[in-house]
């Protein structure tokens, strides 16, 4: 499950970013919804909450408001990836 997440999460966030860049709020909302759910399942709750917030903004038709939230999500995803890689390597306490 961790390996699948590490492969798919960056692509989902990129899909949200691409959706926003293209003015496709529905695509962004769908990508964020998927990332929200998978992040929550693995315990990446801060990233899940950021995605939920982004999903709400996209649904409201305000995709321009998502730029800073997507930057924060990208930073949080980087931390989650580090954490999950440490878990896979047995380096967590």
Which residue ranges define each predicted feature?
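Helix-loop segments that flank and shape redox-cofactor active sites
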Residues: 11-27
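Hydrophobic alpha-helical segments characteristic of transmembrane helices
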Residues: 29-32, 48
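DHp/HisKA histidine-phosphotransfer helix
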Residues: 24, 31, 69
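Amphipathic, coiled-coil-like alpha-helical segments
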Residues: 6-7, 12, 38-56, 60-93
